Structure formats: C-alpha cells, structure tokens
C-alpha cells in the first residue's frame, strides 16, 4: 500500500455512504425536485469549469504573440462571461418553478412540529375525524396526501430537515414557517436538526413513518384514545410518586403537562432520546436516572435517588404504553 493516508480517507468516506440520511434516496416530490436541481447544477458547474480549463490550456499552448489583443478578449468574453451567464440563466429558469409552494386544500392534514433542546414536539391538528393528538420525536404521514407542516421553536433556532422528503427550513421562536410535503412511498426515514442549537445538537433526530392512507387513518383514530398498558403497576406508582407527571403527559391519566415529551404510546417508539438509543429496558432505566450522560444539556433532571430496580420498574411501565 503506497499511500495509506489516501486509503484511510477513502474508507472513511465510504463509511458515510449509506441511505439512512441521504438527499439522493428520496421518498417525496419536493426532495426529488431538489435532487434533480442538484444534479443539473453540478452538470452546469462542470461545464463552466471545463470551459475555463479549455481557455487556460489554449492560452498556455498558444505561441507567444499568436493571440492578438482583440482575439484574446473575444475568447474571454464569449467563453469566460457570456457562456457561463447563459448556462446560469438557463439553470435559474429551470429552478424557478420548483420554488413555488405546493397547492393546499382546506381538508389537508396539518401537523405542528416544534424544535426544543433537544427533542421534537409533534401535534396533529384536530379534524372532522377527531380531536388533536400530541406526540414526540416521531412524525407519521399518509402516503399520497398533501401534509402541511407548521414549524416553530420554543427556545433557540433549529433547522428542520428530512433529507428524503423535502429541503431544510428554519424553526424560529415566535414565528411559524410552513412546509408542504407529499410522501410518495411508504417506509421509515430519518430527519434531523440541521442547525447548531446546543450541546446535544448532533443527538437530535426523529423518525418519519410514511404509511398507507388506510393504515394511517386507523393509527390516528387509535392513538387519539388512552394509552394501553395503564393500571396499578409498581412502575406507574413510582412514576406518580417521583413527580414525572409534572413534565410529561400520558393520555388516559391525570398527567397532562407539556414541559417535556408526551409519553403516550411510548412503547410504540423505535428510539429513545430523540433518535439516539434503542429503547431497551436498560437504556430507558439509565436515561431516567442520569439523562445528562446520554444527552448533555438536556433539561430533564437526574434521579439518582431511584434505585436501579425502581428505574427498571418505571421503564417496564413506559414500555407497556402502546
């Protein structure tokens, strides 16, 4: 191996080539337009670069005095200014229609998403089918339907980005930005915060689950009800006794606080802590006792007074909320 550093860099680059968070593996119309524009812009930039290289090579190879002043100026004018301007103008005309927002209708599903340090509050708007619904760190969408995402923030500026669905949009405290999307295929995808927002910025992801319309309607109707798994368990008693309900809501109980993530249907979620850990019993118990270890800067206080067995009991209770 003549150049180990080159191979090391190449291998590190290959390690980042996966489809988990890629703007090239799309499942939405908006992301498809972004991908097509990116490809065309890359081609246009390559053409302009090639023209400039040709001018440079032509000038190097020409004998001294072979190009007159006026001849050289014409080459520079046409190939160095007019040509690139025409290419860039054509690319701009192509991109303008894609900047127009998608049309919406009064009956379209509206989902409010708010970025907080360091998690996501998700609220499905009320409709004729039923009341609103609050969740956290997971967004479910019906395939083939237009969805209006109303984006805001509670603390600092965040940036909402689902690479495979649409472009980035800032989430600004005190302001609501709208992003209209339409998923084209079912599946589970990843979204992230794309703007530095604090210590755990890199630990702030969320799941996007695109579902067949019938499955989505059934899920939404079921999720509006009380969480299954409620009862007189030891974990629920500990949850109540240690004041967890002062920050977290669970539908079907007296807890309706809105400071921290809503824990209703927690047992259905695929990740813990906004996409950073698998929701195993051990991880949930450890997060309850010392959340700052997994997520520095999180506002949830530690509970060192809980024994390991007590934390595990609360974890079992949360796992049963489905």
Feature names for model-found ranges:
Residues 26-63:
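Membrane-embedded alpha-helical segments of integral membrane proteins
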Residues 321-322:
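Short, solvent-exposed mixed-charge patches
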Residues 11-13, 42-56, 81-91:
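Hydrophobic alpha-helical transmembrane segments of multi-pass integral membrane proteins
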Residues 1-19:
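N-terminal secretory/membrane targeting signals
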Residues 5, 38, 42-43, 77-78:
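Hydrophobic alpha-helical transmembrane segments
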Residues 18-36, 63-258, 275-296, 302-316:
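Non-transmembrane, membrane-proximal soluble domains of secreted or membrane proteins
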């Amino acid at each position: 191996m003549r150049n180990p550093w080159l191979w090391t860099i190449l291998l590190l680059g290959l390690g980042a080539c996966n489809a988990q968070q890629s703007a090239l593996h799309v499942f939405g119309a908006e992301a498809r337009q972004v991908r097509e524009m990116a490809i065309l812009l890359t081609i246009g930039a390559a053409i302009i670069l090639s023209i400039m290289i040709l001018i440079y090579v032509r000038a190097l190879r020409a004998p001294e005095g072979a190009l007159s002043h006026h001849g050289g100026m014409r080459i520079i004018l046409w190939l160095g200014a007019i040509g690139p301007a025409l290419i860039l103008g054509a690319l701009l005309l192509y991109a303008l229609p894609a900047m127009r927002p998608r049309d919406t209708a009064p009956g379209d599903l509206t989902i409010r998403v708010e970025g907080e340090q360091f998690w996501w509050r998700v609220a499905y708007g009320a409709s004729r089918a039923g009341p609103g619904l609050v969740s956290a760190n997971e967004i479910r969408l019906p395939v083939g339907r237009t969805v209006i995402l109303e984006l805001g923030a509670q603390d600092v500026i965040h940036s909402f980005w689902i690479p495979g669905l649409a472009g980035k949009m800032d989430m600004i405290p005190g302001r609501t930005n709208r992003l209209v999307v339409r998923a084209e295929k079912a599946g589970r995808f990843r979204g992230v915060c794309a703007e530095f927002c604090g210590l755990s910025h890199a630990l702030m992801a969320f799941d996007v689950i695109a579902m067949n319309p019938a499955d989505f309607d059934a899920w939404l109707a079921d999720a509006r009800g009380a969480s299954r798994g409620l009862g007189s368990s030891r974990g629920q008693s500990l949850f109540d006794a240690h004041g967890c309900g002062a920050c977290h809501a669970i539908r079907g109980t007296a807890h309706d606080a809105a400071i921290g993530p809503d824990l209703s249907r927690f047992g259905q979620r695929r990740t813990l802590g906004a996409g950073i850990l698998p929701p195993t019993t051990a991880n949930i118990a450890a997060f309850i006792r010392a959340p700052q270890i997994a997520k520095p800067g999180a506002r949830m206080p530690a509970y060192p007074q809980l024994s390991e067995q007590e934390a595990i009991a609360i974890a079992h209770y949360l796992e049963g909320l489905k």
